[in-house]
Structure formats: structure tokens, C-alpha cells
């Protein structure tokens, strides 16, 4: 049985996105993050907007379980770019959720199946800030996985957005 396309996804079509106010956009972004969180099996993540800096489009704050999206990015960039940012940051919530909740001392977690989650946990303990080392930041397991997920998930969502 095929799931019905959530109606809010159609608002991420460029023609629709450009008609939305900042308030409408943050609501849509929250709905997108909720949708992805449910698919990933994690608690919902709060999404807020604010001015970050000149290079950061968004970030996930693990302590607050919150995504902050740069307000200029949200207002000025394409729906596609903002969608990819939210997918990327929601995936970080998933990564941190697993890193926090898996018992890495159990025998089962020592199997190869958990290698990726273990690498995320280790990376979260030794995270490289992109402002200090852009190359090191980009090569981290957390960032590589989130980028790959966001690109792949956008490909999956695109037909629903364009319906």
C-alpha cells in the first residue's frame, strides 16, 4: 500500500516556496523535520531560525534537541537548498540519538552492525569545528553520513514535492 504524500511537501516546490512568508517557511521546515524524525524513529526536533554567521546554513544542538536554520538562508536560498539543510540537520539528530541511546558496552553493540553508530559516537566526542578546519570537518563520519543522507532523501522527496 502506497502512503499518501503529505500535502506540506508541495510547498517546497520553488514556485510555492517563493510565495511563503518567513513564518510560513519555518512552519514548513518544522513539518519537514517532524516527517523525517518519524521516518527515522526519533523524537521530534524543535526548529528555530536566527542569524548564525556568514557560512553556517544551519546546525543541530544536541543539548537542546534543536535545529537552528540561518534566517538569511531560509529567506533567500532555494527551497531545494533549505530542504537539504533540514534533512542534513535532522539526520544529525538521528545520529546523536543513536550515539546516546545505544549501550556500547553490550556484546551485541560490539558487532560490525553497529560500526557506523560507534563511529558517530566517537566522532561526537571529538568533533572538528568547520570554522577551525573545513577539510577535517567535512571528512568526519557524522558530516559525511549526514550529507549522503540529505542528498539521497532529497531525491526520494523530489517527486512528491513536484507532484
Go through the PLM ranges and name each one.
Residues 2-63:
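Auxiliary, metal-adjacent structural segments of Zn-dependent hydrolase domains
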Residues 22, 80, 139:
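Flexible, glycine- and charge-enriched loops at secondary-structure boundaries
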Residues 43, 100-101, 160:
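Short, polar/charged, Gly/Pro-enriched helix-capping and turn/loop motifs at alpha-helix termini
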Residues 49-80, 93-97:
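Active-site scaffold of zinc-dependent metalloenzymes
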Residues 81-89:
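Short alpha-helical catalytic segment bearing the HExxH-like zincin motif
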Residues 89-107:
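Catalytic Zn2+-binding segment of zinc metalloproteases
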Residues 104-163:
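Metalloprotease/metallohydrolase-associated module, dominated by Zn2+-dependent proteases
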Amino acid at each position: 500500500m502506497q502512503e499518501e504524500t503529505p500535502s506540506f511537501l508541495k510547498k517546497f516546490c520553488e514556485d510555492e516556496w517563493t510565495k511563503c512568508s518567513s513564518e510560513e517557511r519555518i512552519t514548513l521546515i518544522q513539518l519537514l523535520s517532524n516527517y523525517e524524525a518519524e521516518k527515522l524513529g526519533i523524537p521530534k526536533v524543535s526548529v528555530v531560525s536566527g542569524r548564525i554567521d556568514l557560512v553556517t546554513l544551519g546546525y543541530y544542538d544536541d543539548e537542546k534537541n534543536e535545529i537552528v536554520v540561518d534566517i538569511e538562508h531560509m529567506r533567500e536560498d532555494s527551497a531545494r537548498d533549505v530542504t537539504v539543510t533540514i534533512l542534513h540537520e535532522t539526520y544529525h539528530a538521528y545520529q546523536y540519538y543513536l550515539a546516546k541511546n545505544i549501550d556500547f558496552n553490550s556484546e551485541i553493540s560490539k558487532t560490525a552492525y553497529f560500526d557506523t553508530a560507534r563511529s558517530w559516537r566517537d566522532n561526537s566526542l571529538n568533533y572538528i569545528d568547520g570554522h577551525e578546519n573545513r577539510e577535517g570537518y567535512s571528512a568526519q563520519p557524522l558530516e559525511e553520513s549526514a550529507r549522503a543522507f540529505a542528498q539521497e532523501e532529497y531525491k526520494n522527496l523530489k517527486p512528491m514535492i513536484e507532484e
